[in-house]
Amino acid sequence: FRTIGGDWNLLSAAAGLLNIITITGLGKIIVTSPGKRSVRGLIWVDMVWPWVIAYDLWNHAFLYNSLADYTWYCTLALLLACTIPAFTWAKGQWIWFRCFTLVFWISMNTLLPEVLVPPSDIFNFATMDPRANIVCAVVALVANVMLFAYWLYKIVVFKRNPITGVLYCELGEFRTIVREHCDDKDKYFLVDRIPETPEELGFEPESPTPPLD
């Protein structure tokens, strides 16, 4: 695969570093509560749209700047395959879909490499235009700087721990995920390290008393 070096790689690296720093809610990853859905999913409830969009923009910039000739299907198609479900019928399950799409991609690339390299029908050569490289990198960096500022605001103003607790529980997407996938036990678990209650955050439990277990 062809690539060209430039300052855009430094910008992309900075965006990627910010994206790693702003990963939140590691201590609150759950599985759909029994009885809530016919298919139980892996739910990373704090991985909501601000982080997903910033990640997608960074990942696109990184791969376009590093492996430009397969950006169309390795970046755009793979990212849409997990982002569209995460924004529609599978809220809170972006990480699950991302894992599956990467597994399929790596497996196909390993088992059927002749399909994914020239001169296959789905292969297309990138323009190798430095202006495109710098635009992708700048957009990714700006998005991740904005995400970092929002992340820092949530930590400082609300005094929340981004690792052991959750940050984005005021967002509508967060509330939707909790209502669709969490029973009372998980609702109380998600907020056990912040002062706000499930009622105050908009996902009322059936019982006002946390389960004993």
Predicted regions located by residue number:
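Generic multipass alpha-helical transmembrane bundles of integral membrane proteins
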Residues: 1-93
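Compositionally biased, intrinsically disordered low-complexity regions
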Residues: 27-29, 167, 204
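C-terminal transmembrane-bundle signature of multipass membrane proteins
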Residues: 74-202, 211
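C-terminal amphipathic "assembly/sorting" segment characterized by alternating charged
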Residues: 207-213
